[in-house]
Curated annotation (Swiss-Prot):
Residues 1-57 are annotated as: Disordered. The ESS and SH2 domains are required for JAK phosphotyrosine binding. Further interaction with the KIR domain is necessary for signal and kinase inhibition. CDD domains: SH2_SOCS1. The keyword Iron-sulfur does not apply. It comes from Rattus norvegicus. The gene is Socs1. Interacts with multiple activated proteins of the tyrosine kinase signaling pathway including JAK family kinases, TEC, KIT, GRB2 and VAV. Binding to JAKs is mediated through the KIR and SH2 domain to a phosphorylated tyrosine residue within the JAK JH1 domain. Binds the SH3 domain of GRB2 via diproline determinants in the N-terminus, and the N-terminal regulatory domain of VAV. Interacts with the Elongin BC complex (ELOB and ELOC). Component of an ECS CBC(SOCS1) E3 ubiquitin-protein ligase complex which contains Elongin BC, CUL5, RBX1 and SOCS1. GO terms for molecular function: cytokine receptor binding; insulin-like growth factor receptor binding; kinase inhibitor activity; protein kinase binding. Residues 162-211 form the SOCS box domain. This is Suppressor of cytokine signaling 1. Residues 25-36 have a biased composition (Low complexity). Essential negative regulator of type I and type II interferon (IFN) signaling, as well as that of other cytokines, including IL2, IL4, IL6 and leukemia inhibitory factor (LIF). Downregulates cytokine signaling by inhibiting the JAK/STAT signaling pathway. Acts by binding to JAK proteins and to IFNGR1 and inhibiting their kinase activity. In vitro, suppresses Tec protein-tyrosine activity. Regulates IFN-gamma (IFNG)-mediated sensory neuron survival.
């Protein structure tokens, strides 16, 4: 009996040799102290946008707005409006053209809408087109006009003939544009409504009633 008890004692696992277990947190402690609710993060304050740094000044009246809008539509239809073309780009296109060739483009000056680039005897140059009190005039000139295209027609027909033929983006013009130009030149802008035409043709003539 003593021998068996001794063997049993030798084969037994002592309490000290057992792996220690980490104490687990009691459920009572977690339930008794619930986690505090998270506070919502404050929304970042977005600064108000500064006034837009626009190229053009604000219109002084609704009539000025209508006149510039009408002028822009006519420019889109004329064929020699080159949009945001730079001064250098305009002069390069005019350099090999005959004297008097011109084009209209957007002005880079903050106080002007448009600029006139023309091939002079001394080379290409650009002139600002001012719009003041509802009228157009060239920089350095006192002659004013209700319409930008009346200004261009004036300098095309002037004795000094400052302007010649416009530089169009498309060299070959459609036949209907050429016919319209001839009709306007023969009848006159003020008499277009008297021509016995159907409304479609009359609207087409009045869409660009100039001789340029």
């Amino acid at each position: 009996m003593v021998a068996r008890n001794q063997v049993a004692a030798d084969n037994a696992i002592s309490p000290a040799s057992e792996p220690r277990r980490r104490p687990e947190p009691s459920s009572s402690s977690s339930s008794s102290s619930p986690a505090a609710p998270r506070r919502p993060r404050p929304c970042p304050v977005v600064p108000a946008p500064a006034p837009g740094d626009t190229h053009f000044r604000t219109f002084r009246s609704h009539s000025d707005y209508r006149r510039i809008t009408r002028t822009s539509a006519l420019l889109d239809a004329c064929g020699f409006y080159w949009g945001p073309l730079s001064v250098h780009g305009a002069h390069e296109r005019l350099r090999a053209e005959p004297v008097g060739t011109f084009l209209v483009r957007d002005s880079r000056q903050r106080n002007c809408f448009f600029a006139l680039s023309v091939k002079m005897a001394s080379g290409p140059t650009s002139i600002r087109v001012h719009f003041q009190a509802g009228r157009f005039h060239l920089d350095g000139s006192r002659e004013t006009f209700d319409c930008l295209f009346e200004l261009l027609e004036h300098y095309v027909a002037a004795p000094r003939r400052m302007l010649g033929a416009p530089l169009r983006q498309r060299r070959v013009r459609p036949l209907q544009e050429l016919c319209r130009q001839r009709i306007v030149a023969a009848v006159g802008r003020e008499n277009l409504a008297r021509i016995p035409l159907n409304p479609v043709l009359r609207d087409y003539l009045s869409s660009f009633p100039f001789q340029i």
